[in-house]
Amino acid sequence: MSTNAIFLTGFFDELKRRKVYRVAVAYVIAAGGVIQLASAVFPAWELPNWTLRLTVLLLLVGFPIALILAWAYDVTPSGIRMTPNLALATGGVSNRVHHRRNVFLLGLSGLILAAVAGFFLMPRLTALNAEKSIAVLPFENLSADKQNAYFADGIQDDILTNLSKIRDLKVISRTSVMGYRGNPSSARAIGKTLGVGAVLEGSVRREGNRVRLNVQLIDAETDRHLWAEDYDRELTDVFAIQTDLAQKIAQELQAQLSAREKEQILRKPTENGEAYFAFVQASSWHTSLESFDKLKAAEQLYLRAIQLDPKFSLALANLSILESWIFHAFEPVEVRRELARSYAQRALDSQPDLPDAHLARGYSLYYGDREYDAALRELAIAERGLPNDAQVSLVMGAIQRRQGQWQESTADLEKAIGLSPNDVWVLENLAYNYQMLRDYQEANRVVDRGLAIEPRSTNLWLLKSRLAIDERGDFGVAEKALNLLRQPAIGAGLKGKGELSAEDRTILLLSSANVALLQGKYEEALATLESAEDDAFSGKPGGVFEKRFMAGLAHRKLGHEAESQAAFSKAKEQAEAELRAAPNDAPRNANLARVLARLGKKDAAIAQAKHATELLPESVDAFAGPEMTAMLAEVYAVVGENANALGLLDGLLSRPSGVTVALLRLDPAMDQLRDDRRFQELLQKYGDGS
């Protein structure tokens, strides 16, 4: 017999003598039991899905360790003792070499077996997780009255909301599935795009006080119908239908439903059918975020629902969130902030354990009060009850970047994208993170992903344009974007948004003028600004001011001093009017400072600019605060305070901000610094010296 054969025979004899076989079998049986128990218990304890995968990974890593310990030690009546080594006892170099070889071979065998087990087991867990995932597609409205489309949307939204409360399920957000309305795709294609194992589709017919609902649950892997259900009930039974559906879907997908989750699903949001109908229409307009007019219409419908049912906690919570958004994006006035606080508190008073009420309180603390830690605590409570709500992760990420926690912010925004993969608003927010960090490769990757979903997104195209200017001073992307966005959607042969909204039209006009100014095409900028009356620029908050201000800049560059002074004076009047409505709004204070600087009012401009930075310092807001610092630097540069301007710009270039070397080379506001040697040194310090 060869030496190797003798060695292997001895090795297997040692495994038997040291009871390694017995330990290996016992370990496999015990590990299998632990995995089975964890699969059943972890969802009931509301632990995240990754905890099960971590448990399996630790068990796999522990297998070779258990084998080595079994080789080295033995359990005797006297306790645990080191197993005597017969080979070493007989002496000889050869035996000692064989001993080391045995230990190495044992460890290697354990690792190989663990790796093989992991190869087969981990994909099974991932597949199991994919099976416990669902997209609820928009329901088809079969009612003769097309107004009932809101009702069909409400049914879909409520079913989705109920399912999203189940932690053991992955539920794709409403925003990411709405693109499939009237857009026939196979369940397999939808499942692949959204990363889900099942798709729910259905139709709703409402006639008088009766509602008929037909739903089908489809396996996204095979396109096979798992089950179908027809409901023909009184309108008052609509909540019972939604509850029944959520429980049946969870059962079909083998998702564990905790007692707390079941209680939340069984709870009716309101007993008043008319209040519910007003609520679903309000929710549809609210979530679309199409225009300020639509948001104000949604506000009135929420108020109608609350008037019909003053204890309608979900309506109170949604109205609070709406008021917070209006305060943040349109009207930063005290009355909006107080309304957001009040409605959130009423929702909590009415139903303290409603996750949406804590979400509303989180929004109010974030947008209204800038109390970030308190807001995150409320959102953590909301997340426990809404584990699949992308909105929660999105707002968490938005808050964290204002705290300067860029890594945590990016992780939460990535999580939101996982729950809402087709939501370009979430992708846009993630791209802003990378822009501030000057990671242009990642920013462009995210923007391109969004444009693949919505090829005519005004915000994404303009962000992509800004990225090219920020990084390289390249206007090619901007010119392409502006030309594309000016084309009618149908004529351009593109899917996505058709007619531009009033806000998008304003943004397009202002962006066209701004790009022309940066390129030194002052006559073109002026022609764009004068191509429409002031009303055409009112679709965006601050749009009229920006029009007048940029007109002043263009006239000054063209040597039209009288026209420049007139435009800046009108811009000043507009800035003062906007500031009177919201005196504590930092951007409005900044706008007044910028125009005062152009009018030669040096001291007033500096004081106003400093006030803006005090209202929104970087220590309070690491995301928007740098913009106020950059504005103060701009004012210093315009009024001839070069040293102060350069000091601020140096700091902004050294940390996350929207200021870049390429942009400073182009910005007309920096013209008075260009001949300053220190400015050139600053550009060389952070740039390539070109």
Residue ranges of model-derived segments:
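An N-terminal, helix-rich hydrophobic module
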Residues: 1-115, 119-120, 224
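Acidic, proline/glycine-rich low-complexity intrinsically disordered segments
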Residues: 41-44, 95-555, 560-563, 567, ...
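Phosphate/oxyanion-binding loops and surfaces in catalytic or ligand/nucleic-acid-binding neighborhoods
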Residues: 61-64, 71-78, 166, 220, ...
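Alpha-helical adaptor scaffolds
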Residues: 359-367, 398-401, 432, 590-637
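TPR/TPR-like (Sel1-like) alpha-helical repeat modules
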Residues: 486-488, 568-569, 610-613, 647-655, ...
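Hydrophobic, well-ordered secondary-structure elements that form the walls
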Residues: 593, 633, 645, 673, ...
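C-terminal structured "cap/appendage" subdomains that terminate the fold
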Residues: 634-666, 671
